[in-house]
Amino acid sequence: MGVFNYEIEATSVIPAARLFKAFILDGDNLFPKVAPQAISSVENIEGNGGPGTIKKISFPEGFPFKYVKDRVDEVDHTNFKYSYSVIEGGPVGDTLEKISNEIKIVATPNGGSILKINNKYHTKGDHEVKAEQIKASKEMGETLLRAVESYLLAHSDAYN
């Protein structure tokens, strides 16, 4: 098994605490609402949202795969940090054991925030991660962030 790691950073004008509430704590409800072209539904399979929770994320018709199952590994409300692993569906299967993701939202001096994402692809055998998988993951993250950001800018009273 190999581990391929890559990091993404994206800036937002939304304050860190507010973005954490919307993007992380209520993303299950918000993503299908603000980005239905990316996520059609999120179903809680097991758990209460904390570590060990299993979620099924379904994708719209025409997406490369129908669903993924995520396991929540950590929710740190103080440091605006969230970790989860993709354990089933999507790209996980013959060549990937799992994908571990850590998201940290850091406040910036101007009142906005930086979304820092660290992704670790755990491959099976000597398989390598394809550039298309990384590109698709980056695009999904950017789509969701911008959709949530637009929603929060349009709804100044939400998630305060």
Swiss-Prot record:
Gene3D superfamilies (alphabetical): 3.30.530.20
Cross-referenced Pfam families: Bet_v_1
Positions bound to brassinolide: K55, Y82, Y84, N101
Alphabetical GO biological process terms: abscisic acid-activated signaling pathway; defense response
Main location (coarse class): cytoplasm
Keywords assigned: Allergen, Cytoplasm, Pathogenesis-related protein, Plant defense
SMART domains: Bet_v_1 (SM01037)
InterPro entries: Bet_v_I/MLP, Bet_v_I_allergen, Plant_def-hormone_signal, START-like_dom_sf
Compartments, record wording: Cytoplasm
Single GO cellular component term: nucleus
Role, per record: May be a general steroid carrier protein.
The family this protein is said to belong to: Belongs to the BetVI family.
Protein name stated in the entry: Major pollen allergen Bet v 1-F/I
Gene name of the encoded protein: BETV1F
